[in-house]
Amino acid sequence: MTTSHQPQDRYKAVWLIFFVLGLGTLLPWNFFITATQYFTSRLNTSQNISLVTNQSCESTEALADPSVSLPARSSLSAIFNNVMTLCAMLPLLIFTCLNSFLHQKVSQSLRILGSLLAILLVFLVTATLVKVQMDALSFFIITMIKIVLINSFGAILQASLFGLAGVLPANYTAPIMSGQGLAGFFTSVAMICAVASGSKLSESAFGYFITACAVVILAILCYLALPWMEFYRHYLQLNLAGPAEQETKLDLISEGEEPRGGREESGVPGPNSLPANRNQSIKAILKSIWVLALSVCFIFTVTIGLFPAVTAEVESSIAGTSPWKNCYFIPVACFLNFNVFDWLGRSLTAICMWPGQDSRWLPVLVACRVVFIPLLMLCNVKQHHYLPSLFKHDVWFITFMAAFAFSNGYLASLCMCFGPKKVKPAEAETAGNIMSFFLCLGLALGAVLSFLLRALV
């Protein structure tokens, strides 16, 4: 009876807003790690000035090789990637977990807007420091503090967005995943353009950081526009109501009447305003979504275990000494290839959601991704110690990477979409937060697994 009165998402405005928010969660951090060469170059120079260093094939290879002095590879530069991973993964896990328990006590608007503003501030400071000279140790410490802050607020932002999308129809988690996929594509293109242009490291890095600021500002504006969307308000009010009130709430909205609490409740509400029945047991929710939660965790464990630790070490077998081998093979065949097909996989869930949320095929397909571990490890990886190179030709690697990336994007997006729909509407936000935690757990486990897989090649 009431379904005919449900508002439509006019011009797909809410869908597009969540797409931009998804882009805003990942693009800043992707640009930050894309500028790793800029950070290590500043740590490698005694005066900490990288303003005159050009980005070239030679400098890219040198910075990737710990045995190369450039002019002298400092101890801070040598440990940069390991410490960066630690400073990124620990806050990501801790704050995603905290958000699962505290999201009802801290308002949603504070968590999302506060996180976006904090990330914006960090990137403004980062862009400013490109032009500031300082000693290597101070630069290293400040950079690690920024990494902790970006990932702490990024974890809160991502978990809160997945929780917010959980109160909408299932396919509204897809634009967040798709936006995150597009972030990877943008950074890959930016990396290739920077290498091709031979631009100074500082100029490329400054461009990355300013672009990140612009995207975060756009995400803030989009989030502020959400309360004006009737479609969004409709599902938010439905979620705020208890199960017995939902039918009445639908009728009130369809007749143009404001539910009790007026327009104020129609804004971007904080979980502290939710009724007591939202305080559901975490264990009960986990019992409903554990298969999907473990699935998304396993997906990202396999993905990060191989990409980029193993895949970025593959070299072209057909290019000889051409620029394709030395400059473009890894940026194109590895990073761009992965990000394009990952984005396509994530985006496909907007129009196709097979298999269904209760289908046994979903966890089976997730488990089948383990086959990519031997396939990619048997490609033409540099410095093989234990495994032969059975798939030497570039076509094998490019094909495996495309399937690897597409399955990652599609299956992960399905799991994230279905998780909040396996529970009651009042539990959807908590379920979304829990799914986000297991996603981050998969990233952390994958980072640990990557050391083992690389050592076994």
UniProtKB/Swiss-Prot annotation:
Main subcellular localisation: membrane
Segments for region (Disordered): 255-275
Family note: Belongs to the SLC29A/ENT transporter (TC 2.A.57) family.
Transmembrane stretches, start-end: 13-29, 83-107, 112-130, 139-157, 175-199, 207-227, 292-311, 324-343, 361-379, 395-414, 433-453
Stretches of the chain found on the membrane's Cytoplasmic side: 1-12, 108-111, 158-174, 228-291, 344-360, 415-432
Entry's free-text remark on domains: Cys-415 near TM10 is a major determinant of nucleobase transport activity.
Any GO molecular function: cytidine transmembrane transporter activity
Regulation affecting activity: Transport activity is sensitive to low concentrations of the inhibitor nitrobenzylmercaptopurine riboside (NBMPR).
Expressed in which tissues: Expressed in jejunum, liver and lung. Expressed in testis at the blood-testis barrier (at protein level). Expressed in ventricular myocytes (at protein level). Expressed in kidney.
Basic and acidic residues bias: start-end ranges: 255-266
GO cellular component annotations of the record: apical plasma membrane; basolateral plasma membrane; plasma membrane; postsynapse; presynapse
Compartments, record wording: Basolateral cell membrane; Apical cell membrane; Cell membrane
GO biological process terms on file: adenine transport; adenosine transport; cellular response to glucose stimulus; cellular response to hypoxia; cytidine transport; excitatory postsynaptic potential; guanine transmembrane transport; hypoxanthine transport
Location of Phosphoserine modifications: 254, 273
Residues flagged as site, Essential for nucleobase transport: 415
Subunit description: Identified in a complex with STOM.
Gene: Slc29a1
Organism: Rattus norvegicus
Residues modified by glycosylation: 44, 48, 54
Designated name of the protein: Equilibrative nucleoside transporter 1
